[in-house]
Amino acid sequence: MNFIRSVGAKTLGFIQSLGSITLFLLNILAKSGTAFVRPRLSVRQVYFAGVLSVLIVAVSGLFVGMVLGLQGYTQLSKFKSADILGYMVAASLLRELGPVLAAILFASSAGGAMTSEIGLMKTTEQLEAMNVMAVNPVARVVAPRFWAGVFSMPLLASIFNVAGIYGAYLVGVTWLGLDSGIFWSQMQNNITIHYDVINGLIKSAAFGVAVTLIAVHQGFHCVPTSEGILRASTRTVVSSALTILAIDFVLTAWMFTD
């Protein structure tokens, strides 16, 4: 009986959380005028959410590409198919690994920072002070961060992809001796803009919406204590990672299956 009660409580809690975050998203969309009328607010957040994440995304992409190049060359060589290494790495990064890994890195760095920042503003009653001054905190604080994250995520995924392909090139061509022309020509002949590049960007944009929405929602509704901010930041990273993987499965089934 206790098990059934526990499952029921968790199910109701999940439905309530889903409803809360949906209403919060609608509120952000309704209050987004300030983010576009005063673009300085969003541009500043693009710097904090996007530009400051470029280094970790680029370095991670480089090493992921190097690993893919090494593992791919080793396995493909067994079947005399090492020539398709460039295509294999590019397809893996553009369709799957680039958007997913870049989004998880974004969630763990910029997402957690957004939650902590908004949570600190709530703890120090800055959000309440905005309400007293007739300034809507969703329009002033949340919406610019939301749109900055949505805009930054596809760019970060693209940087991850470029760094990963270059990493595979370093390993496959410079180290293992694969012909440079074959590496690039296989990629050029088999990668398509719509099927590979555009679908990957759509994925990364969807991840950007999900991660940023979770981050600002957790910060805005956290318990206004230091422990509450810590728990909210942890929930942001964990929930974002699970949501990214769930959305990735749905989008992959829609985009890449007949």
Regions found by a protein language model. Name each.
Residues T34-V59, V238-A241:
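Membrane-interface helix starts
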Residues M1-L41, Q218-V223:
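Short, membrane-interfacial amphipathic segments enriched in basic
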Residues A139-A148, V237-T257:
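Hydrophobic alpha-helical transmembrane segments of integral membrane proteins
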Residues S60-F63, A102-A110, A143-G172, I214, ...:
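Hydrophobic alpha-helical transmembrane segments that constitute the membrane-spanning cores
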Residues Q71-L94, V162-A205, V209, L213-S233, ...:
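Membrane-interfacial helix-loop-helix connectors in multipass membrane proteins
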Residues I56, S60, A82-M114, A148-A157, ...:
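Loop-to-helix entry region at the N-terminal start of transmembrane alpha-helices
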Residues I118-A143, S226-I229:
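Short cytoplasmic-facing helical segments at TM-TM junctions of multi-pass membrane proteins
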Residues Q45, N136-A157, A232, T236:
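Start (N-cap) of specific transmembrane helices in multi-pass transporter permeases
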